[in-house]
Amino acid sequence: MEMLRRNFFRLLMVLVAGCGLIASPANALVEININKGNVEPLPIAITDFLQGELAQKISGVIAADLKRSGLFAPIDKGAFIEKISNPDATPRFEDWKVINAQALVIGRVTQEGDGRLKAEFRLWDTFAGQQMLGQQFYTQPENWRRVAHIIADAIYERITGEKGYFDTRIVYVAESGPKNARKRQLAIMDQDGANSRALTNSNDIVLTPRFSPNRQEITYMSFENQQPRVYLLQLETGQREVVGNFPGMTFAPRFSPDGQRVIMSLQQEGNANIYTMDLRSRTTTRLTNTAAIDTSPSYSPDGSRIVFESDRGGKQQLYVMGADGSGQTRISFGDGSYSTPVWSPRGDLIAFTKQSGGKFSIGVMKPDGSGERILTTGFHNEGPTWAPNGRVLMFFRQNAGAGGPQLYSIDLTGYNEQLVQTQGFASDPAWSPLME
């Protein structure tokens, strides 16, 4: 892990109090209450960072991140009156207020003598005439996009009061080829679709990739050698290993919150039950024991409870149990069937796929089953995954016809549904924790 941090990221954030980049008092006027649902996006001016093409690319990614969140409306640069030539100078606030820029971002990117980039920015509340935030970062030039995502996260958090989610990655199943002979391989990308690369390269079917809590491993299911098995993949080295050598099919894996166990389904004699495997001792523990199909387990953030799907009542429904398998209780009672549950990182909600009336929906409910809300419905929506701040979901959608699945994101309130750009067809997304 330390090698990965040294060789890949090489990134250091410095809060520069000594250079005057100090956050203003907490009573600045600019704020967004993201609990209100369909909020009006905040007009924000994001100037081209000085100096050069790379600096402008960084400010462009920042603007794209904030716009995609649905909470910010970057103002067209053609409307800017003041042309920033000195990021250290106090802006002419009247020039920004007249175009209704309630917040202003200015910045600069320079190259140090050792080759590193130095990226710095300031966030201003134009109507209060106060600086809200100022930071600077050092990184290797190849990591410029990550710096942009980190700055966007800082702006998002300062204005909304919630952690951002832009400095994250998505692992997913990349699909190519005709529908009746589709090739599926694991791929990974930034949350905005950039920096995509394949993690596997074979004709074996792969499904349900999931990140470890430290983002260094992925667990997934593969049909390698015609035997469905759960695997672990080390992202840094590419090394793979089978999680247990069981006589039956293993599938639907997911890490425990502490990363020490993998929970999964094991199919034997026509039914499937939920097991955990300790990754150090390789010992397994059986958690369910029914003649049904119990699958898609997901831990609560504190690791004390597990939500899963089961058809023990005749059709797929959601159940919650203790981490030791105790107290198995059904929580879904609406029309239709429920599947692919996943617990929110905040612990307050469970997202799911619901099939009813010939359509598939993505929804959320509280862990006791109350407060069910459908966020989006279509021909085939499936496989929700949470952003690490628990405010945004990603899922995949298959439309009717000969095309393939695509990834979409949607706000927890059901607004701001957006297509996530990928190089080809994509399914089974999983959101990483925030990078460090």
UniProtKB/Swiss-Prot annotation:
It is found in: Periplasm. GO terms for biological process: cell division; protein import. Pfam families: PD40 (PF07676), TolB_N (PF04052). Gene3D superfamilies: TolB, C-terminal domain, TolB, N-terminal domain. It comes from the Bacteria. One of its GO terms (cellular component) is periplasmic space. Residues 1-28 form the signal peptide. Keywords: Cell cycle, Cell division, Periplasm, Signal. Part of the Tol-Pal system, which plays a role in outer membrane invagination during cell division and is important for maintaining outer membrane integrity. PANTHER family: PROTEIN TOLB (PTHR36842:SF1), PROTEIN TOLB HOMOLOG (PTHR36842). Belongs to the TolB family. HAMAP family: TolB (MF_00671). The Tol-Pal system is composed of five core proteins: the inner membrane proteins TolA, TolQ and TolR, the periplasmic protein TolB and the outer membrane protein Pal. They form a network linking the inner and outer membranes and the peptidoglycan layer. This is Tol-Pal system protein TolB. It comes from Rhizobium meliloti (strain 1021) (Ensifer meliloti). The lineage of its organism: Bacteria, Pseudomonadati, Pseudomonadota, Alphaproteobacteria, Hyphomicrobiales. The gene is tolB.
